[in-house]
């Protein structure tokens, strides 16, 4: 989720470059899955109108507007886009038993930022225990972090000073083994603190 950052205005050059990028990805990867994020939607209360609609016509790209459970390589996976209400999220999670959750999630106890060296904790309604035994790979929070079964993959590059000291890159998950590989982004600019 959050392929785009601005929910109300995206420049034409940006639109064209993103379409070209996903067409390129589509030629390389047979299966590209995107969960709708809160910055991809027009209305805060609905995933119906989204900037991601422009990508749904590209081969091999699948966009999740609503939560869906699928079996992939023998593993039960929940694809969970942005849900505006913690109560709806809890209700959904109570009704599923899955191996993996992939989504745009706001989970209590997760660190929101490294800004100014102060750790900000989100005290939301959904907790790591609500996911039972599932391994959770989540977006929404920009910094990479692991807390038991919760894995925020973070942004692939630094966006602001709050990313200082946090590794950026891409996480690759092998569903058959459950093992991950992190490839650090050593190309993009980084925010650093100078003493």
Task: Give the ranges of each region predicted by the language model.
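Core catalytic region of metal-dependent phosphoesterases/phosphodiesterases
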Residues: 1-69, 127-133
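Divalent metal-coordination and catalytic microenvironments
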Residues: 2, 18, 37, 77, ...
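Active-site environment of divalent metal-dependent phosphoester hydrolases
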Residues: 5-8, 33-46, 70-71, 84-87, ...
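Catalytic phosphate/metal-binding cores of nucleic-acid and nucleotide-processing enzymes, i.e., regions
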Residues: 8, 16-28, 32-34, 90, ...
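Short, well-ordered alpha-helix to beta-strand connector turns
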Residues: 29, 74, 96-98, 132-134, ...
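Hydrophobic/aromatic beta-strand patches that form the interior of the parallel beta-sheet core
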Residues: 33, 64, 78, 100, ...
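Binuclear metal-dependent hydrolase catalytic cores centered on His/Asp/Glu-rich metal-binding motifs
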Residues: 72-126
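Conserved beta-sheet core of the metallophosphoesterase superfamily
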Residues: 113-183
């Amino acid at each position: 989720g959050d392929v785009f950052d601005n929910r109300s205005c995206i420049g034409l050059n940006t639109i064209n470059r993103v379409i070209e990028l996903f067409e390129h990805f589509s030629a390389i990867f047979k299966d590209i899955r995107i969960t709708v994020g809160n910055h991809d939607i027009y209305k805060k209360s609905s995933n119906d109108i989204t900037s991601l609609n422009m990508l749904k016509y590209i081969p091999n790209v699948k966009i999740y507007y609503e939560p869906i459970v699928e079996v992939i390589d023998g593993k039960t996976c929940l694809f969970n886009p942005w849900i505006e209400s913690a109560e709806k999220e809890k209700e959904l999670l109570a009704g599923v038993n899955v191996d993996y959750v992939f989504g745009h999630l706001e989970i209590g106890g997760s660190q929101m930022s490294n800004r100014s060296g102060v750790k900000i904790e989100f005290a939301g309604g959904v907790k790591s225990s609500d996911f039972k035994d599932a391994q959770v790979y989540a977006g929404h929070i920009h910094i990479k972090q692991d807390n038991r079964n919760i894995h925020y993959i973070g942004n692939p590059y630094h966006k602001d000073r709050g990313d200082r000291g946090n590794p950026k890159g891409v996480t690759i998950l092998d569903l058959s083994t459950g093992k991950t590989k992190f490839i650090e982004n050593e190309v993009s600019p980084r925010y650093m603190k100078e003493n």
